[in-house]
Structures are given as structure tokens and as C-alpha cells.
Amino acid sequence: MRKLTILGATGSIGASTLKVIAQNPQQFSIVALVAGVNVAKMYQLCQQWRPKYAVMATASAASELQGLLKNQAMATEVLYGEEAMCQVAALDDVDTVMAAIVGAAGLLPTMAAVKAGKRVLLANKEALVMSGQLFIDAVAQSGAELMPVDSEHNAIFQCLPTEIQTQLGRCDLSQHGIDHILLTGSGGPFRYSDLATLDSVTPEQAIAHPNWSMGPKISVDSATMMNKGLEYIEAKWLFNTSREQLKVLIHPQSVIHSMVQYQDGSVIAQLGEPDMATPISYAMAYPERVTAGVPALDFTRLQQLTFMEVDFARYPCLQLAMDACFLGQHATTSLNAANEVAVDAFLKRKIRFTDIALINDQVLSKVCATNTQLHCRDLESLLELDTMARHFAHQVLKERQA
């Protein structure tokens, strides 16, 4: 039986993970649940799953949860803060860690799981975007098992030979007859919108993704296609690709989750309903397969599968991410930080939808003008760079609002 810590238990990935565990109680059990400040949801999960540990982001949230659990005479130990998150990610009696804390906040707990040699189910793409080579090196040094959970990377993983699956980050695609990887994306809710109307897009419109059910931040990232940009960077590190070996394609139906094109002309694709329980169950049970509670894809109901080239005028954030990917670690770390600040400001109605790309561009340019790869030797310097990029982003925000 696999014993899990779930980082990000109250989010959408956490919910899908628990759905898979509920379907397969003989194969998986929960040791620790980790969340931000959603006490009501965490209390509900503690009642249902009875974890040994529950970790909240803040002391006040932990105190509130502790009070609720005490009233029910529950034995779950309540902890709080980043150090506690890292602690439960590295517990001896845990062998699998679902890394699903959104954004830069997930980096240190995810890295703690890696350094402890766990099977790390990587749903937090920002961890790789921010730390790249450091992350891959830590996986190699500890013997951790890296399993991609993002539907696209999981799809690519399923389309690759076993030799590459067991050598993520250090594989040679061409040696195994692979020409390139095709990363698919739906294009989000505005793929057919008049470009002139994007200025006036509301947070509610941006969050309404046509195919996937996701949290607010990732939904906005899908609308700008920054999400695909972050996935592009993650794919570069996971599959050790050159620029020529990694391509992005718009696929509105989200049925083909990604494809691998081989040198002999063959293309292997992974298809399925757009439900995160499928890639999560695959990553949890690998190399076996278990019930995910997802309906089978009904080919008779598929009207068509269509594909389009990316229009970078519509998706400038994707272009920024693809360029940053091959500029160096300083570029991807700072772009991710700027984007988190910009998306948060958009969700709070402080800026327009189209301002997200402008802020990202300005911060990236400023960081690249003052920093080089030499600044990214360790986690501390990466976190300093992250802080600096956020400071720049807040400065740009103030200037735009002045």
C-alpha cells in the first residue's frame, strides 16, 4: 500500500487525488494533508480521511482547525507553516507525495520530498519552472521518482519508452528515435475572440475554461496561455529537449492531451476525457493502472478533432515563456514570479487582462538586463530572485495605476 502526503489537499488537484484514493482504498492511504487557509474544507477532509497530520499555512488557520478537531475528539496532529509542510513531505512512513500547492509556495515542500527520495507526483509546475537544473540534480542525487501529473506531461510520459520514463531530466530523445514532442493546449476561452475585446475581459470570463475544471489562477493562465508556457518550460526540463524538439499546438477539444512524433514518421498520442483523475491515477499507481472513476472516451460522440498553429499576437505570454525557457534560469524564475503578481492583480480587478503580458514583459526585460545565470546556483539565490522579480512587478503595477 502506498502512503501519501497531499500538498494542496483543498484544491482541485487535491480533490481529484482523493477521488482516486476513494476508488482504490486497498492501494492508497493518507498520512498527511497540507493546505493554505481553507479551514472549513480541511476540517471536512480530516473528518473523512482521519490523517495523522494536518498542516495549514498560518498559525491562525491551524489554531482554528485545532479547535474544531478538539471538539470532535480527533487525534490528527495540527501543524502550520512552511517548515511543517517540508517535514510532512519527508516523513519516513510516507513513500508518495502529491505536490499540488499552487505557485512558488510549493517549491520548498516539493524539494523536501525530492531530497527525501519520495515518489513525487508533480502537479506544481512552478517548482521546475523556478528551479530547473537544481530540481533535476536533486532528483538524481536522492533517487527520488518523478512522475508528471499535468495532463500534458503525463500524456507525453505515457507515449515514451520505459528507458526515458525512468531517466526524466537526463534522457536523450533522439537516441530513442524521437523527433519532437507536441504539447497541445485548448487555447482557452478567448481563442476566437476579437483581439480588440481582450482589453475588457473580466475575471469571471477568464476563469470560465471551456473544457477543464481548475482553480482561478491556473484558469487565468490558461486564458493567457501562460499555463502552456509554464508547461513548455516544465517539459523542457522533464524531457531534456532542445528548442527544435518541443512544439506547441492548439487543440480546442482537449481530447488529445499531447503527442510524441518519432523519426520514422509515427505519432503516438494519449487521449482521454478532460479529467485530472486519469493522469493522477496513472502517476500514483505506475507502472500499474487503477480505476480512476473517469468515464471511457466515447469515440462515437466525438464530432471532430481540430488543430491550429499558435497565434502569438493573441497569446504574448506564451511567446515570453518560450523565449525565457532558453534564456536561462533567471528568466524563467522571474517570469513566473511576475506572472503570479500580475494574475493576482487581475483577479482583484486592479489591472486589465491584457496588462498581464505587459507586466510580465517589463519584469522579464528588467531582470534579464541586471542578472545572469550565475545568480542561480542554489535555492536561496533563486528565492531571492523570485522576491526581487515580485518587487519589480509591484513597482510596475504602481506605475500603471499612477
Curated annotation (Swiss-Prot):
**Mind listing the UniProt keywords for this protein, alphabetically?**
Isoprene biosynthesis, Manganese, Metal-binding, NADP, Oxidoreductase
Q: Which reaction(s) does its UniProt entry say it catalyses?
A: 2-C-methyl-D-erythritol 4-phosphate + NADP(+) = 1-deoxy-D-xylulose 5-phosphate + NADPH + H(+)
InterPro entries in the record, alphabetically? DXP_reductoisomerase (IPR003821), DXP_reductoisomerase_C (IPR013644), DXP_reductoisomerase_N (IPR013512), DXPR_C (IPR026877), DXPR_C_sf (IPR036169), NAD(P)-bd_dom_sf (IPR036291)
EC number(s) reported in the record: 1.1.1.267
Q: Which Gene3D superfamilies match?
A: 1.10.1740.10, NAD(P)-binding Rossmann-like Domain (3.40.50.720)
GO BP annotation list? isopentenyl diphosphate biosynthetic process, methylerythritol 4-phosphate pathway involved in terpenoid biosynthetic process
User: So where does 1-deoxy-D-xylulose 5-phosphate get bound?
Assistant: K125, S151, E152, S186, H209, S222, N227, K228, E231
Binding residue positions for NADPH: T10, G11, S12, I13, G36, N38, N124, E126, G215
Q: State where Mn(2+) binds.
A: D150, E152, E231
Recorded GO molecular functions are: 1-deoxy-D-xylulose-5-phosphate reductoisomerase activity; manganese ion binding; NADPH binding
Protein family (similarity comment):
Belongs to the DXR family.
Against PANTHER family, the record matches this protein to: 1-DEOXY-D-XYLULOSE 5-PHOSPHATE REDUCTOISOMERASE, 1-DEOXY-D-XYLULOSE 5-PHOSPHATE REDUCTOISOMERASE, CHLOROPLASTIC
Function, in words: Catalyzes the NADPH-dependent rearrangement and reduction of 1-deoxy-D-xylulose-5-phosphate (DXP) to 2-C-methyl-D-erythritol 4-phosphate (MEP).
Annotated protein name in UniProt: 1-deoxy-D-xylulose 5-phosphate reductoisomerase
Q: Which organism is it from?
A: Vibrio cholerae serotype O1 (strain ATCC 39315 / El Tor Inaba N16961)
